Amino acid sequence: MKLKTLSVGEVNNYVKKLVENDFILKNLNVKGEISNLKFHSSGHIYFSLKDENSKVNCIMFKNNAVNLDFRLEEGMKVEIKARLGVYHKEGTYQLYCENIKKAGIGELFEEFHKLKKELSEEGIFDEKYKRALPKFPKRIGIITARTGAAVRDIINVIQRRNKSLDIILYPAKVQGENAADSIIEGIRYFNNEKSVDVIILGRGGGSIEELWTFNNRDLAYEIFNSRIPTVSAVGHEVDFTISDFVSDMRAPTPSAAGELVSPSLQEMINDLLNKKEFLHRAIDRKFLNAKKDVDLLHKGLKGNNPKHIIEKRIKEVNSLEEKLNFLGKRKIDKAKDELIALNSILQTLNPLNTLGRGYSVIMDKKDKVINEVSELKKNDMVKVIMKDGSVNIDIKIINE
């Protein structure tokens, strides 16, 4: 019996009918770990279900997805009720899920959270250790696969923003055996050479297994100990790895990392203009302060000019002279007044003035005034002083 030659479409349709009519394949209960999880804008959910040895693609349409009472996560272990279907155009099969139940967190996620907790307690995620990225780097180091979307995206963004920046690529394995060691070697290379200002650790998106290289303890400590600031750009925005937590900065995507580390030419121009304005203001302030100092010195010198000092001293001497003249005259006038007063008193007390009123003074030969008759005896010679002269008289008769 000769078998009919079938087209590819006929083969796929035949397999599709066999699968869809198989009772077991229409009523499957399958357990495994979720990976490659995607929530489509249509409301459908796409993911893979895997175990240690195999993987199968799955889809849950919106009408079933709305009945889930929990949110699916990468690495989550689940049990699904599904039917196996064949996509005849591609000749592939997948599980169409009707219901999903939790079966526990996946082993990789358990390991991830355990390591994250340990490293957090050891303090290497602390904000106090995070360094600011250089504002205007000259050379940027990239550690990623030599080929792939990640390196292309990073380089394209940097060159678009600023063609003057140097880019140095250290090609490293980012997935599979010894990948973590390869990235560690790249970090050490840049630190030993001191050839770049910032390092980007990059990798495109993928499942938790594909990103697992960046959940390595040794790599985490190498990033922590790097003397050069690091940016982790691993996977997509929803993907998180240990490298993200320990790096100085996390970029949601490799392209975003290129934006973070590369200042645009306009930013550099604006910075230069700002610095120019700052310098102008600083110079103006310096000039004004110096002018004030010069003015103060000028005033000081003017005040200490010998000519001005002499003129000041002359004025002081003239003032003192006037004061002395005034005080001297006042002193002399006072003395004259006192002399006049004394003279008046003397004139009043002068015996000669008494003689002018008809009185006379009798004195003995020793010019002693004789006040009483008892002081005389017969034949004594006395002098009688009168207003206009004196006479000498011999005492002949004494009447008592």
Curated annotation (Swiss-Prot):
GO terms for biological process: DNA catabolic process. It is an enzyme of class 3 (hydrolase). InterPro entries: Exonuc_VII_L, Exonuc_VII_lsu_C, OB-fold_nuc-bd_dom. Keywords: Cytoplasm, Exonuclease, Hydrolase, Nuclease. The keyword Nuclease applies. It catalyses: Exonucleolytic cleavage in either 5'- to 3'- or 3'- to 5'-direction to yield nucleoside 5'-phosphates. Its EC number is 3.1.11.6. GO terms for cellular component: cytoplasm; exodeoxyribonuclease VII complex. It comes from the Bacteria. Pfam families: Exonuc_VII_L, tRNA_anti_2. Transmembrane segments: none annotated. CDD domains: ExoVII_LU_OBF. The keyword Lipoprotein does not apply. It is found in: Cytoplasm. Bidirectionally degrades single-stranded DNA into large acid-insoluble oligonucleotides, which are then degraded further into small acid-soluble oligonucleotides. PANTHER family: EXODEOXYRIBONUCLEASE 7 LARGE SUBUNIT. Heterooligomer composed of large and small subunits. Belongs to the XseA family. NCBIfam families: xseA. This is Exodeoxyribonuclease 7 large subunit. It comes from Clostridium perfringens (strain ATCC 13124 / DSM 756 / JCM 1290 / NCIMB 6125 / NCTC 8237 / Type A). The lineage of its organism: Bacteria, Bacillati, Bacillota, Clostridia, Eubacteriales.
